[in-house]
C-alpha cells in the first residue's frame, strides 16, 4: 500500500543498526561461476583483499541478507545480496558501473513489517509518500516525482534505486532517519523505485529477481 501526504509527521526511531540476530553465511569465489579460491564469512569484513581474496568473481548467499560495497571500509557503491547465487559481478550490480567488491556486512532485518516515508526536500519537508508492506517499481506511477531528498525508514529494511524497475545504483535504508541524501551516500536526490529487503526467517522467497 502506498499513500501520499502533504506534511511531514513525527519520526519513530533513531538511526541504529541494532543487534544482529539469526544466522548469516556467504561464500565468495575469486572467479566467475563459483570457481577458484573461496572463502566463507559469517560476520562483517571491512577489507576482503587484505588476506582473503584478490577479487570477487561470484557469490553464493546461503543465509542473509548482506550488504556489499565497492570499496574497503563499507564505502562506495552498495550491492544488496539476498539468498541465492550470483555467478558474475553483473548479477549483483544493477548499475553495471563497477565489478569491484571489497567489503561487506550482514544486513539487520528487525521486523517482518515494512513502513517507509519519502520526502521531496531535506529535513522531512515538502511532499511526502508513505509506503507500507509493498514494493514500488515506479514512484511516478503513484504520482510521486523522482526527487527524494530525505527518508524515514520506520519499520523494516528497504533498498531504493536510481531508476524505475529496480535499476541503477542501490541505496539501503535501515530503520532510522536520513535527513539528507548524502546520509545514504547518494550524489543527488534521485530515487525512482523502492522495495523491501525480506529475510527468509519470515519470508521464504529468497533472492529478489532483478529485472
UniProtKB/Swiss-Prot annotation:
InterPro entries: Beta/Gamma-Crystallin, Beta/gamma_crystallin, G_crystallin-like. Changing residue 75 to H: In CTRCT22; uncertain significance. GO terms for biological process: lens development in camera-type eye; visual perception. Pfam families: Crystall. Has a two-domain beta-structure, folded into four very similar Greek key motifs. Homo/heterodimer, or complexes of higher-order. The structure of beta-crystallin oligomers seems to be stabilized through interactions between the N-terminal arms. Crystallins are the dominant structural components of the vertebrate eye lens. This is Beta-crystallin B3. The gene is CRYBB3.
Amino acid at each position: 500500500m502506498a499513500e501520499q501526504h502533504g506534511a511531514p509527521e513525527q519520526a519513530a526511531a533513531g538511526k541504529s543498526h541494532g543487534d544482529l540476530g539469526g544466522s548469516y553465511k556467504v561464500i565468495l569465489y575469486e572467479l566467475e561461476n563459483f570457481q577458484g579460491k573461496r572463502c566463507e564469512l559469517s560476520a562483517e569484513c571491512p577489507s576482503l583483499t587484505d588476506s582473503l581474496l584478490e577479487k570477487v568473481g561470484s557469490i553464493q548467499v546461503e543465509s542473509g541478507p548482506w550488504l556489499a560495497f565497492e570499496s574497503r571500509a563499507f564505502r562506495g557503491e552498495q550491492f544488496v545480496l539476498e539468498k541465492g547465487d550470483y555467478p558474475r559481478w553483473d548479477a549483483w550490480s544493477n548499475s553495471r558501473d563497477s565489478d569491484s567488491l571489497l567489503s561487506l556486512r550482514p544486513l539487520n532485518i528487525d521486523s517482518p513489517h515494512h513502513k517507509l516515508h519519502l520526502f521531496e526536500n531535506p529535513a522531512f519537508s515538502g511532499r511526502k509518500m508513505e509506503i507500507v508492506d509493498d514494493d514500488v517499481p515506479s514512484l511516478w506511477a503513484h504520482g510521486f516525482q523522482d526527487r527524494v531528498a530525505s527518508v524515514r525508514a520506520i519499520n523494516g529494511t528497504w533498498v531504493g534505486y536510481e531508476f524505475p524497475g529496480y535499476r541503477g545504483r542501490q541505496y539501503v535504508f535501515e530503520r532510522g532517519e536520513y535527513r539528507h541524501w548524502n546520509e545514504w551516500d547518494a550524489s543527488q536526490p534521485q530515487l525512482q523505485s523502492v522495495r523491501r529487503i525480506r529475510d527468509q526467517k519470515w519470508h521464504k522467497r529468497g533472492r529478489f529477481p532483478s529485472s
